[in-house]
C-alpha cells in the first residue's frame, strides 16, 4: 500500500470520514514569505503606542526609537518567541467542559463579530443593533450544534459606548454556554471583563486552567500597535486567556496591492504580536489570525466575499501551520446586504475553503455587508 493510500485509510478508520486538505503555497514560497516578514520587523520595525510593550521589547534586546515610537525586532528575538508560543490551545464552555481544541486541522465556526447593524427579517431592513437583537443572536448561537463558539456578535446602540465591551460579555455569559470570542474597547474594560470570567470559573487559577474566552486584538495596518491592542495582549498573557491577533491589511490601501505583499504584512503583524505576548508571559496562548481583504478602489469597500480575500486568508493560515501556531480567519461571511443568493454563494464558498484549509477558528457566519451587519439567517 502506498504511503498516501495508507494515510487516507488511517484517517477514515480513525474519524469515519476523510477531508481533503487545501494547500495553495509551495514550501519554498512559505519560507520566502516568512523570511520577508521577519525582514520587515528587523529593518522597518513596528510602531508601538504602549509604554509597557516598548519596555518589554527594549529589555529583550529590540532596538527602540523613542522619537518615532518604533521597535525593531531582531531575528534572535523572533526565534526565541516562536519557540515558546503554544501549538495547541484548549478552550472550555461555561460548565468547564472542553469545547475547542485548537490544533492541527481541527475546525470550529463562530458568528462574525463587532457588527454595528442587524438585518431585521420581520421588517426587511437594516437598522442599528439593540440589546434585544444581541440576546436573540446569542441564544440562537447556543442552539446551533455546528456553531461551536459564540462571539460578541454586534454592538448594541442602546447602551453607552464607554461600557459596550463589558455589557456584551455580560449578555453572552448570561444567554449562552459556549466559549466566547470577545475583546476590549477601552483599556479600563479588561479588569471588569476578567472579573466576570473569574466569577464563572471560581478563581483566577481555574480560569487559567480552563479559559472560557478568547480576546481579539487588532493591530493597525501597516505595522502599528495601538495602546489598547498592546495592553490587551499584555493583560491576557499572564491570565492564560488566549489572544487572537487580527491584522486587517487592505490590498492597495493599507498594504501592498499584491496578494503576496498583503500576506507578508499579515505575517509580520502576527509575528510581532506573538513577540509582545511571549515577552509578557512565555508560553502565553496566541492564535494567528486575520481579517484581510482586497480593496475596491472605485467604491472604497473591502470585498470580504471576493476570492482574492479568501486566497489571502487560506495562505496566511498555511504559513501559520508551518510555524505550528493555532489559526483563525474571517471567512464564511458575505458582502450582500440581505440573505439572498449572493450571500449564500459567498458564505458557502468561504466556509468550505476555510474548512478545507483546516483553519481552527472560523469567524463569519451571519455576517453581511462588508462585516457591518449581522443576520439571524
Q: Whereabouts are the PLM-identified features?
A:
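Catalytic alpha/beta active-site cores
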Residues: 70-247, 251-256, 260
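C-terminal catalytic subdomain
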Residues: 337-377
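Short beta-alpha connecting loops at secondary-structure transitions
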Residues: 18-22, 298-304, 332-339, 366-376
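Phosphate/pyrophosphate-binding betaalpha-module
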Residues: 272-328
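N-terminal alpha-helical transmembrane segments of multi-pass membrane transport
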Residues: 14-15, 20-88
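Short, Lys/Arg-enriched N-terminal segments with co-localized hydrophobic residues
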Residues: 1-12
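Acidic, His- and aromatic-enriched active-site or binding-groove loops in soluble protein domains
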Residues: 170-182, 264-275, 312, 352
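Glycine-rich phosphate/pyrophosphate-binding loops
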Residues: 247, 280-290, 326-331, 357-370
